[in-house]
């Protein structure tokens, strides 16, 4: 039993390492740098998808901080879409199965919404967001899931609830929180 669980932990570690390497290769590509050998099979399909979708990446690996709500994170990209909406894009490596679509995990739209608010100050009427899923089991397979302003607004509300719960459980108060004082 111990041997099997060690193997499972190794698989998780290997998957995380591959995801990190794919992210690094994508970052290199979009900065105009050399893509590490062996990663073109992941990078090229993503580049083609982004071009086909009319997405223009404006900033890469951007650290975002929301001091009033008390959270921070690093987004993969800030972008403009084909109709001029600004948004947040995050790459996700994922094991996929042939014929089954990539669907966001529950927290992924919340992450995009939180980054939108940290970057732009709110979920504006022209906000957009997307996750680009890169298959680690079907080389060359990439899919995009886009989020509308309505979806981002709902995800932001969910994120705020989760953040409030986390802050309560951890006894954390944002240093610049502008809420009521008791």
Where is each model-derived feature located?
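Metal-dependent nuclease catalytic cores that hydrolyze phosphodiester bonds in DNA/RNA
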Residues: 1-72
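Polar low-complexity intrinsically disordered regions
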Residues: 2, 108, 122, 181-182
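Mg2+/Mn2+-dependent nuclease catalytic core
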Residues: 62-169
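Glycine- and charge-rich intrinsically disordered segments
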Residues: 172-182
């Amino acid at each position: 039993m111990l041997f099997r669980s060690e193997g499972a932990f190794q698989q998780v570690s290997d998957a995380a390492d591959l995801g990190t390497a794919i992210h690094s290769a994508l970052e290199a590509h979009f900065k105009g740098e050399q893509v590490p050998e062996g990663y073109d099979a992941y990078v090229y399909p993503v580049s083609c998808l982004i071009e086909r979708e009319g997405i223009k990446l404006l900033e890469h690996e951007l650290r975002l901080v929301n001091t009033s709500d008390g959270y921070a994170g690093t987004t993969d990209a800030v972008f403009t879409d084909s109709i001029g909406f600004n948004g947040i894009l995050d790459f996700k490596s994922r094991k996929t199965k042939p014929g089954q679509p990539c669907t966001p995990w529950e927290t992924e739209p919340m992450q995009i919404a939180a980054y939108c608010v940290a970057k732009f100050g709110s979920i504006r009427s022209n906000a957009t967001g997307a996750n680009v899923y890169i298959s680690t089991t079907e080389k060359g397979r990439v899919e995009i899931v886009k989020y509308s302003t309505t979806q981002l607004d709902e995800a932001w509300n969910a994120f705020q609830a989760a953040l409030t719960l986390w802050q309560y459980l951890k006894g954390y108060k944002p240093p610049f929180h502008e809420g009521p004082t008791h």
